[in-house]
Design a protein with these regions (language model features):
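Conserved segment of the helicase C-terminal RecA-like domain
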Residues: 110-116, 120-154
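Conserved interdomain linker/interface between the two RecA-like ATPase lobes of SF2 helicase motors
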Residues: 1-31
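Conserved helicase ATPase core of P-loop NTP-dependent helicases/translocases
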Residues: 31, 40-44, 48-90
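SF2 helicase motor core recognition
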Residues: 84-102, 118-123
Length: 210
């Protein structure tokens, strides 16, 4: 599994997509959420070999190292960081206003965590007009959590979630745009159809939102 997560083919695909969707502003200030420590560290190395300036931060990273990385990501200096790869940290309680691209490489296990990670890029800043969120969906069984998180619907109504996938941008307030490619849309529909919304974990997630 590790070899697949860090394969040259996967790295090329990730880079292709982050370049395709781009960012707002003069410089990239990106956060990339990974699923495991070894993946986080290896992907950072592979990005660096391709000319990006990145660092991997995990729960083992010191507070000083984290702060220096954040300061560098926020900077526009020539040698400042383009991306921070992270796992197990930055879900909440961290403020990096210049973040203009958030990349999800980890499975969506919880609507709450998904929103927390997405929120790292939602701080207002004069250097950007919007934030780009790119989610490389991997956990097919839990894909229904994506419309749950983005819509704010906590009743887990399947018809409402299907409608949001179909008409997300029309149902989202403000100038936000939500776009699913055809494969992603199909997998989310399949996940909604197969989901058992009486599971204990979903009930716990809903309770935490109260």
């Amino acid at each position: 599994e590790f070899n697949i997560l860090t394969s040259e083919l996967r790295v090329d695909y990730i880079i292709e997509k982050i370049n395709e969707y781009g960012y707002s502003g003069d410089h990239i200030h990106g956060l990339i959420f990974c699923s495991r420590k070894d993946e986080c560290e290896k992907l950072s190395q592979l990005f660096n070999l391709r000319g990006y300036k990145t660092i991997a931060l995990t729960g083992d990273s010191s507070e000083d190292m984290r702060q220096k990385a954040i300061d560098s990501l926020e900077s526009n200096d020539e040698n400042s960081l383009d991306y921070i790869f992270t796992v197990d940290i930055f879900n909440e309680g961290i403020d990096i206003p210049k973040v203009n691209q958030v990349v999800m490489l980890r499975p969506t296990e919880s609507a709450i965590v998904f929103v927390q990670q997405l929120g790292r890029g939602l701080r207002k800043n004069d250097s950007k007009e919007y934030v780009v969120i790119i989610d490389f969906i991997a956990n097919y069984e839990k894909n229904f959590l994506i419309p749950v998180a983005l819509s704010g619907q906590t009743n887990y109504n399947k018809d409402s979630l299907r409608q949001f996938v179909c008409e997300g941008s029309l149902m989202t307030p403000g100038a936000s745009t939500i776009q699913f490619d055809q494969i992603t849309e199909k997998r989310i529909y399949q996940s909604i159809d197969a989901a058992n919304f009486t599971q204990v974990r979903l009930i716990k997630d809903s309770y935490k939102q109260l």
